Amino acid sequence: MPEICPICGLPKDLCVCEEIAKEEQKIKVYVTKRRFGKLMTVVDGFDADLIDVKDLAKKLKDICACGGTVKKDSIELQGDHRKKAEEILIKMGFSKDMIDVR
C-alpha cells in the first residue's frame, strides 16, 4: 500500500504539493557585498516546509558553476548570478511573476 501525502491526500508518487508550492512562492533575488568586496547572490523567500531548499541550492550551484550555501530559508551563491538564477528558477517551475530580481 503506497504512502499517502498528509497535505494533498494523494499517494506519494502522485503528490503535487511541491509543484503547487513552487507557483505560490514569492522569491527575491538580489546581490550583496561581502568581506573583501566579494559579491554574493541571495535567493530568498522559500517556504522550507514545502520545498527542498538544499536540493534546489545544489541544482543552482551546479548550473551556475559556483559555490554557495543554504542559510535558514535562503540560498547564497558566490558571485553575481541574478539573471541566470532567475532563468533557472523559471525553468524549474517557479512563476515568473513571483520572482523579484533587484
UniProtKB/Swiss-Prot annotation:
Q: Which InterPro entries match?
A: DENR/SUI1_TIF, SUI1, SUI1_arc, SUI1_arc_bac, SUI1_dom_sf
Q: Name one GO biological process term.
A: formation of translation preinitiation complex
Q: Does the keyword Protein biosynthesis apply?
A: yes
Q: Which residues form a coiled coil?
A: none
Question: What's one Pfam family the UniProt record gives for this protein?
Answer: SUI1
Mind listing the UniProt keywords for this protein, alphabetically? Protein biosynthesis, Translation regulation
Domain of life (superkingdom): Archaea
Report the family membership.
Answer: Belongs to the SUI1 family.
The protein's name is Protein translation factor SUI1 homolog
